[in-house]
Amino acid sequence: MITDQNSKPQQGELPTTHIDALTNSFSQFLRIEATSGAVLLLATVVALTLSNSPWSDGFRSLWETPIGIQIGAFQFLRSLRDLINDGLMTLFFFIVALEIKREVVLGELRNPRMVALSVVAAAGGMLVPMGLYLALQHGQPGQHGWGVVMPTDTAFVIGCLALLGSRVPPGLRVFLLSLAVVDDLAAILVVAVGYSRSIDWTALALGAVGLVIIRGMALLGVRNIRVYFLAGAIIWLAVNASGIHATIVGVILGLMTPTAGWVSDQRLGEILRKVLSYPPGDHWSGDTEDNRALQVAGIAVRETLSPVERLEAMLHPWVAFGVMPLFALANAGVPITIKGLINPVSLAVMAGFVLGKPIGVTAFAWLGVRTGVAIRPAGLTWGGLVGGALLTGIGFTMALFIAGQAFQDATLNAAKLGILAASVVSSVAGLTLLCALPRSDGTLDADFH
């Protein structure tokens, strides 16, 4: 039996035990966005090391291991890499969609004037790199990879900002997070529209029916998360069979997730007041009215949080420290050769990220501010914005994902090398500039106004 005899809780707090000190620290560790970037970096280094070692053939073969099930005439067989890219990454896109909806409904994206700068800058950060890439690859085999240079990797960008600590103004952090959200949404649309196979409309219709059923369950008040995950898995199978990239299921379900809790704040207060009205004593055990009141209070506390917030808190650590490192291990491994680095596709990818991203983000942000469409957040100087724009050249996770849809074999390896090289150059350039700027940077203001 767990006791709280050694705990010294403050008034209004839950009692603690020795294990809580460890688990709470670990929970805080998991919640730090920068830590997931460090884990992702470690997985990338491991993948690159093994891919350029005597064990490279075995490492490559591992991800091609076929895995699947067969029930009668139904057969589902995929390589381990495909299961990660098409299956587990659906959870990643689900989390991205939850983040987008939370920010739009509850967060920084609620204020149109505040978000306008990020939207305009994100547009420039996608259009300019894409245009530069197409200019370099027009009529070439790599032309189909125009979507590779569009995204920004949130985890790595936040990880870089964490290295700078208090030198990073809150305005820059909000700007980059909002920009990354817009980037992610656009990248999702690119995958769904630009890199899908021929469509099986029957399978797609079955997937659409599944979404209608999920909507109906929500309207009826079904709150069992397991039921929704089971329905989501069935929809995923249908959409996967349709030819449209199945990760779009994660996006749609994430955007369909409610942002309002089932129990209102007022109702929660009433329920808690009822529980607190009981006099002290040993009357919480057994099948009693008091016990049922306590159970109702527990449910009310949980259901006051919106499904978006609960699912994000529940799944984000698993995605950040499980799915994304697995994705990096399965996809970031590529033989590093001079021939690969000077491949036209690799050079076009590097140009798009290292040059196109910062130029597009900075130029469009400046135009947005000068035309009055957008305003800069307090504390975000032009010098800081340029430094942040350099960091947006870190495409990594989404860029590798899109490259896997656009290319095969040697061209895919060249694109991966370009993505990795661009991520290194962009992170070093961005960190160097942000470190060089004074805390109250006004040096670039005169040049932009």
Swiss-Prot record:
Coiled coil stretches, renumbered: none
TM annotation in the entry: 32-52, 87-107, 114-134, 145-165, 174-194, 202-222, 233-253, 318-338, 347-367, 382-402, 417-437
Catalytic activity: Na(+)(in) + 2 H(+)(out) = Na(+)(out) + 2 H(+)(in)
Compartments reported by the entry: Cell inner membrane
GO cellular component annotations of the record: plasma membrane
GO biological process: regulation of pH
Keywords: Antiport, Cell inner membrane, Cell membrane, Ion transport, Membrane, Plasmid, Sodium, Sodium transport, Transmembrane, Transmembrane helix, Transport
GO molecular function, one term: sodium:proton antiporter activity
Any Pfam family hit: Na_H_antiport_1
Topology versus the membrane: Multi-pass membrane protein
Recorded superkingdom: Bacteria
InterPro entries to which the protein is assigned, alphabetical: Na/H_antiporter_dom_sf, NhaA
Function in brief: Na(+)/H(+) antiporter that extrudes sodium in exchange for external protons.
Record-stated family: Belongs to the NhaA Na(+)/H(+) (TC 2.A.33) antiporter family.
Protein name: Na(+)/H(+) antiporter NhaA 2
Gene label: nhaA2
